[in-house]
Amino acid sequence: MENRYFKRDISWLSFNYRVLLEAEDDTLPLYERINFISIYSSNLEEFYKIRVADHKAIATGASQSDEETVQSAAELVDEINREVNRQLEDRIRIYEQKILPALRKHHIIFYQSRNVEPFHNDFVRNFFREEIFPYLAPVPVSKDKVISFLRDNRLYLAVRLHLKGAPVGSPNRIQYFVMKLPYSKVPRFIQLPKVGKDYYLMFIEDIIKANLDTIFPGYEVDSSYCIKISRDADILIDDAANTSEIIEQVKKKVKKRKIGAVCRFVYDRAMPQDFLDFLVDAYRIDRRELVPGDKHLNMEDLRHLPNPNQSVRPIKKPQPMKLTCLDERESIFRYVEKKDLLLHYPYHSFDHFIHFLYEAVHEPTVREIMVTQYRVAENSTVINTLIAAAQNGKKVTVFVELKARFDEENNLATAEMMKAAGINIIFSIPGLKVHAKVALVLRRDKEGRKLTSYAYISTGNFNEKTATLYADSGLFTCNPVIVNDLHNLFRTLQGKENPVFHRLLVARFNLIPELNRLINHEIELARQGKQGRIILKMNALQDPAMIDRLYEASQAGVEIDLIVRGICCLIPGQEYSRNIRVTRIVDTFLEHARVWYFGNGGAPKLFLGSPDWMRRNLYRRIEAVTPILDPDLKQELIDMLSIQLSDKRKACFVDDRLRNRWKSSRPQKEKVRSQYSFYEYLREKI
């Protein structure tokens, strides 16, 4: 049978490669290009710790899956490693042939080995002795007795030595040591004294390599290479666990994350085979876990690379704007009572949402606030404002998702802090994740008779830090049907049965039936010779059932544009997908919004909300999607989608071989960079 879907993880690697390509764009500020190498590397680290770790567990028989066999999992891990190795060549090429020369052009000399100019020899030697040497603790490595534990995602230097005076062939002549780089004590990147117009930088590991003779007196240094281990970081919670059991499992398993099973052993590919073989045997590394790297590993650290030359063009992002209709003296409540409000972050300031909560804290007629928490910032202003509301006599209910990956500890800590302040905390639902990003404020008039509710439905988290980095949209509305639906959703989260939703689309209830109805209507229009039109913007498209519906629509003549940032398992360019185009946008901000357009014969229907079209989102999570009913806001989202589809600078097509194909060029004046164009569009409207 023909394979009609890309493999999820291979598709993700195609996205991450597109991230890497931003480092090659010489129209960007230099340090923004460097940051994209950091993002690429950080993404890859998490990918191995979660996705590859899962496949490896299945391949070794340590875990079971209904979707993979031992053989298919092993083959997929091999395919992933081959693609990562291929991308490594481009990462090295971009770094060495693009980034380093660009730094030199700006008089920033970044040493790439232990060899430095003679005028820096004394500095390197003195800096090592005074700042680094006290924190080094070499540990011997033996095949028979490993006495060191390699910590997750920490950089180590593996050293091979010859004992001076020992005859060739004697058993103790060749010895091996490992040293953890003292990241917590000394920066990864060291600034050396400026000479003339030139600034100099150096990796800490290269300074250590230049002084190995000081660390190991009595030995001759044979060679040294960097290594690192990535460990399985996934946390599996028993679906049958109750709330208290979930809390205990999260606490225990988060602690074990740092000592999880090895899923990747990364090493300097210049390491001789016999050196590598020794380490593999000593640390009991599975050969399938071996991933060659460059001489400098953990390139995610490049986000901390110093910029000593202030004349280098800084990273300049659009600054969040505040709507003039919502200055601090204006009531958001009164505005939303008259007209729905749509905000787009980070173009609009997240302060507007904070002000919405702040107004709820201090408005005497507000009785209750309800919010979902998936990922919040540390020392969160949102959480602090909710605590202030509880202390001010408001009833506050927060649903806390403890199973939000890598945010488990923060969510648990903030939940305990809120609970201590008198907030009603509802924890994770067994067997489900709650991914909906919704808030509800209930307010009665001064006589206590009329109830007015204010709903907020968003594509992004209530996180003031990521709201400056992720491109998301959120709707404020007092629409009575949507508000009532949101009431029902919060009742569902509190354990009430059989909710009914009329306008809000909620995963595991009415979302799939409504999506099928919307797609069917576009198919019927196309079959009648009318225009069938679908535009879907999301982070990931993976669910085979929904992909098949899009294939069906394409074959019926529906024109479909997909704006998918990351995973896309739909294969374009086939007979069954000839009317489907896949666009991917990677730029300054992380595209995170989920916005859906259905042409509806000229009376378009638009929606925004939290789910991607992945099986986990559609079938195993609680997600919320709202229709956009206000004609002006509908047009605003249509314009946003149109701007993104016309992007000729940061958008590319994904072809039938998962290649990122740049869109055909146009005259320079017509080139659209959608994030910046949309920012200007919104600025003109304020």
Where are these regions (language model features)?
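Hydrophobic alpha/beta core scaffold segments
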Residues: 559-563
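N-terminal localization/anchoring segments of enzymes in phospholipid and broader phosphate metabolism
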Residues: 1-534, 552, 556, 568-686
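Polyanion-binding catalytic cores of nucleic-acid enzymes and NTP/SAM-utilizing transferases
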Residues: 546, 550-552
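Short alpha-helical
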Residues: 274, 544-545
